Regions:
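Divalent-cation
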Residues: 1-87, 91-95
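Juxtamembrane "helix exit" motif at the C-terminal ends of alpha-helical transmembrane segments
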Residues: 125-151, 232-257, 270
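Multi-pass alpha-helical transmembrane bundle typical of ion/small-solute transporters
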Residues: 52-55, 65-68, 75-97, 101, ...
Length: 329
């Protein structure tokens, strides 16, 4: 899949939410949620980013780490806001709380949501670490008992272990989002994701932001979170080539080392995304291709109502002074 060449490139990005979209510009971040047939709720979100607190995180590689953390913080705030508004508007059904849930609410009150989110985050991180770091290493060690080329601790074994682990991580990641795409609510989120990309492309092509103009745009964008995740996994394969099969003679340390080097994968992946977004040549097309292919899963064709929400969010964050434009072609 080839990249689409646009007349200009914007720094504006966003994310799909529950019945809505968040758009983030250089001066403003806005969440827009569909709350009725002809109603769109809009609210700005304020957040101090890590680079604003510490100039050091504006440097290459470090800015990728900061960007990922800030994106996760912003996505959480946006998602909670969109979920609340969608439930209030009846766009998403709210189930009757169980006796246990009522007891928890009486016991912890307003702190309940924070407690649940912290608990869920800890469990989620633990599962992710087990699946993406320790499981691939464990399965490779099992395979090494029957695959001769996997055996030993030399350069050949390191190469195959890195490739094996990396490919398995990509399969797990793609399998996860394929399963998510089968859920009704996630299908709609992926449709809003498509609307977000199409709207950004429409703006970059210097076309008026109308439903008709947005609808005809392509939904695969090189500066997407999906592409970033895929690039991180690929960079992780390369980094794995420099980690011994059993550091200091202890096989358990290899996944630990890979976890410690995760910020490097994040930083390099971020820089590659920025390069792919600014330049269109054979090199960047090769780098961007895996992420664009993965977007066939994480983006779907939106309906006109979704496009209207994306346009509303986009218009809210476009600065009057053009400070969002990275370059003009």
């Amino acid at each position: 899949m080839s990249k689409v060449s646009t007349k200009k490139i914007t720094s504006i990005g966003g994310s799909a939410l529950i019945e809505g979209i968040m758009m983030r510009g250089p001066k403003r971040t806005t969440v827009c949620v569909r709350t009725g047939e002809n109603e769109i709720y809009s609210e700005d979100i304020k957040m101090t980013t890590i680079p604003e607190k510490c100039k050091l995180f504006k440097l290459p590689l470090l800015r990728g780490i900061a960007g990922l953390i800030d994106s996760m913080r912003l996505s959480y705030k946006s998602l909670m806001l969109s979920a609340d508004k969608a439930v209030e508007a009846g766009e998403v059904d709210e189930e009757e709380p169980s006796k246990f849930e009522k007891w928890l609410d009486e016991k912890f009150g307003d702190k309940l949501v924070k407690i649940i989110m912290v608990f869920a985050s800890v469990i989620g991180v633990a599962i992710a670490v087990a699946l993406f770091f320790f499981l691939p290493s464990f399965l490779f060690d099992l395979s090494a008992k029957v695959v001769p080329v996997f055996q030993g601790s030399g350069e050949v074994a390191v190469f195959w272990k890195s490739v094996f682990e990396g490919v398995l991580k990509i399969v797990l990641f793609l399998g996860y989002i394929v399963l998510c795409s089968q859920m009704t609510e996630m299908k709609r989120v992926f449709m809003y994701h498509g609307a977000e990309h199409k709207t950004i492309f429409c703006y970059e092509n210097e076309e008026e932001l109308t439903v008709e103009n947005v609808r005809k745009q392509i939904r695969f964008h090189p500066r997407c979170g999906t592409s970033f995740m895929v690039l991180m996994l690929i960079v992780g394969i390369v980094i794995g080539l420099f980690i011994p099969v059993a550091p200091f003679g202890i096989g358990f340390l290899r996944p630990v080392f890979k976890i410690l080097l995760l910020p490097v994968s994040c930083g390099v992946g971020y820089e590659l995304i920025k390069i792919c977004g600014k330049h269109d040549n054979a090199f960047t097309r090769i780098i961007a291709a895996p992420g664009l292919w993965a977007q066939r899963i994480t983006t779907k064709e939106p309906d006109d109502k979704m496009i209207e929400v994306a346009i509303e969010a986009m218009k809210a964050v476009i600065p009057d002074d053009g400070t969002d434009i990275l370059n003009n072609k």
